[in-house]
């Protein structure tokens, strides 16, 4: 009975959060060391340029690691591990956030997430 109640409660929570804000990432792939890749994060339900937006990543078996942030004013900051190799940007007309990743290393292997 407890399981059934928990499940109904979870459904109720999820139903209340339906697609007000959505972030859809794309652009991942398998790349050789030294290669480049650009990640995209298309936003809906809010304006990317009016918020600060971040990229974070999670390497296999590890916790979340902050990668980069872009503020509404356009200022950008990077983790030391990616500085000089990664570039965060946004296209206000497409309401999309980007992460250009160059000179990729084995240690950059991770699942990447955009976040508001």
Swiss-Prot record:
Region listing for Framework-3, in residue ranges: 77-114
GO molecular function: antigen binding
Region annotated Complementarity-determining-2, chain positions: 70-76
PANTHER family in the cross-refs: IMMUNOGLOBULIN HEAVY CHAIN
Protein name per the record: Immunoglobulin heavy variable 3-66
Pfam families attached to this UniProt entry: V-set
Signal peptide positions on this chain: 1-19
Complementarity-determining-1 as annotated region, ranges: 45-52
Source lineage: Eukaryota, Metazoa, Chordata, Craniata, Vertebrata
Region (Complementarity-determining-3): 115-116
Coiled coil: none
Region of interest: Framework-1: 20-44
């Amino acid at each position: 009975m407890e399981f059934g109640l928990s499940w109904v409660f979870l459904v109720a929570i999820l139903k209340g959060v339906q697609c007000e804000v959505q972030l859809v990432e794309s652009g991942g792939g398998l790349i050789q060391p030294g290669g480049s890749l650009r990640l995209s994060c298309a936003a809906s339900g809010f304006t990317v340029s009016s918020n600060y937006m971040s990229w974070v990543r999670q390497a296999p078996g590890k916790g979340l690691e902050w990668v980069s942030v872009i503020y509404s004013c356009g200022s950008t900051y990077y983790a030391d591990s990616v500085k000089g190799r990664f570039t965060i940007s946004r296209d206000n007309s497409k309401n999309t956030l980007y992460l250009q990743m160059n000179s990729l290393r084995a240690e950059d292997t991770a699942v990447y997430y955009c976040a508001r």
